[in-house]
UniProtKB/Swiss-Prot annotation:
It comes from the Eukaryota. Disulfide bonds: none annotated. Component of the cytochrome c oxidase, the last enzyme in the mitochondrial electron transport chain which drives oxidative phosphorylation. The respiratory chain contains 3 multisubunit complexes succinate dehydrogenase (complex II, CII), ubiquinol-cytochrome c oxidoreductase (cytochrome b-c1 complex, complex III, CIII) and cytochrome c oxidase (complex IV, CIV), that cooperate to transfer electrons derived from NADH and succinate to molecular oxygen, creating an electrochemical gradient over the inner membrane that drives transmembrane transport and the ATP synthase. This is Cytochrome c oxidase subunit 6C. Belongs to the cytochrome c oxidase subunit 6c family. GO terms for biological process: oxidative phosphorylation. It is found in: Mitochondrion inner membrane. The keyword Ribonucleoprotein does not apply. The keyword Membrane applies. Pathway: Energy metabolism; oxidative phosphorylation. Keywords: Membrane, Mitochondrion, Mitochondrion inner membrane. Its main location: mitochondrion. Component of the cytochrome c oxidase (complex IV, CIV), a multisubunit enzyme composed of 14 subunits. The complex is composed of a catalytic core of 3 subunits MT-CO1, MT-CO2 and MT-CO3, encoded in the mitochondrial DNA, and 11 supernumerary subunits COX4I, COX5A, COX5B, COX6A, COX6B, COX6C, COX7A, COX7B, COX7C, COX8 and NDUFA4, which are encoded in the nuclear genome.
Amino acid sequence: XLXVPAMGGL
């Protein structure tokens, strides 16, 4: 998700 580095970054 967006802004979620722990879940994928972009």
